[in-house]
Design a protein with these regions (language model features):
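Acidic/polar low-complexity surface segments
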Residues: 1, 27-77
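Discrete beta-strand positions within long extracellular beta-solenoid architectures
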Residues: 8, 17, 27, 74-77, ...
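Extracellular, beta-strand-rich repeat scaffolds characterized by small/acidic residue-biased motifs
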Residues: 13-15, 22-24, 32, 79-84, ...
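Short amphipathic beta-strand/extended segments with alternating polar/hydrophobic composition
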Residues: 26-31, 135, 148-156, 166-170
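Solvent-exposed, low-complexity segments and loops of surface/extracellular structural proteins
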Residues: 83-87, 95, 100-109, 113, ...
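Acidic glycine/aspartate-rich repeat arrays in secreted/surface proteins
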Residues: 120-147, 159, 225-230
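Composition-driven recognition of low-complexity segments enriched
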Residues: 157-264
């Protein structure tokens, strides 16, 4: 990622791959006739014609586009590095691997294979959710539509033209933690995309469940739902939402003891 490139890729055939190393966010665009953003941006300056000494930097001319794929060349595969990369496929059957970081993958036309790798990775599609069929397979998922049939693994989110879908629904994953949190403090909010998205974003940023709960209390969300900011009222609300019956005085006091640290 610290290298400097200013080049055009030409290839006569075979199965080819562009791979980026390092942790800087990069763009790999496999579309023929397109630019990728790899390595350090190109920088320019003015120099004295006699001494060649730099007389003025030209940051206004800085260009992140560094690697060009010739318009008749087909590169099949892209592998990202440790940053939050964007990988764009072409009309071939591409293999796109995000690597580390929270990556965004777009296969385009063709039957593509995509692996998000580490991080919170997203596979994007141009059309609406109704245009595709999502199928669970051994070891991953596949999605079929006008673009072809793609298979993917290590992907946490799908983005369509009209909506986003979270796939990381286990209790240890962010979308699962979001549903658990809202199920306790505000079950009705699970049907509100804006609230779900806001809470999910907090978990994606690394917040713990305790952090999210405290923030919900601080901004008044829990108090608004419970009708009170009193710990005992909040504990009773949470118990009712989870168990379905009111908490006894003893149970409510036990829950409060966890909240205030007496029984942490």
């Amino acid at each position: 990622s610290s290298a400097r490139y200013n080049e055009t890729i030409w290839d006569g055939g075979g199965n080819d791959t562009i791979r980026i190393d390092g942790n800087a966010a990069s763009l790999i665009d496999l579309t023929p006739g397109s630019w990728s953003q790899l390595g350090l941006p190109l920088t320019y300056s003015e120099r004295d014609l006699n001494t060649l000494a730099v007389t003025q930097a030209r940051p206004d001319l800085t260009d992140a586009r560094t690697v060009f794929i010739y318009d008749t060349v087909l590169i099949e595969n892209g592998i990202g590095g440790g940053g939050n990369d964007q990988l764009i496929g072409n009309y071939a059957a591409n293999r796109l691997s995000g690597g580390g970081g929270s990556d965004r993958l777009f296969g385009g036309a063709g039957d593509d294979t995509m692996d998000g790798g580490a991080g919170i990775d997203t596979v994007a599609y141009l059309n609406t959710r109704a245009s595709y069929i999502l199928t669970s397979n051994v070891g991953g998922l596949s999605i079929s539509g006008i673009d072809g049939t793609d298979t993917f693994s290590g992907v946490e989110r799908l983005q369509f033209a009209d909506r986003k879908i979270a796939l990381d629904l286990s209790p240890s994953e962010h979308a699962g933690q979001t549903l658990e949190f809202l199920g306790v403090v505000a079950p009705a909010a699970i049907n509100n995309p804006a609230i779900v998205g806001a809470v999910l974003n907090l978990f994606d940023q690394g917040s713990s469940t305790r952090d999210v709960c405290q923030l919900a209390i601080n901004i008044g969300l829990v108090g608004q739902i419970a009708g009170s900011t009193n710990s005992i009222d909040i504990a009773r609300m949470a118990f009712l939402n989870v168990v379905g019956v009111p908490a006894s005085t003893e149970m409510a006091d036990l829950l409060v003891s966890f909240m205030d640290g007496r029984n942490a």
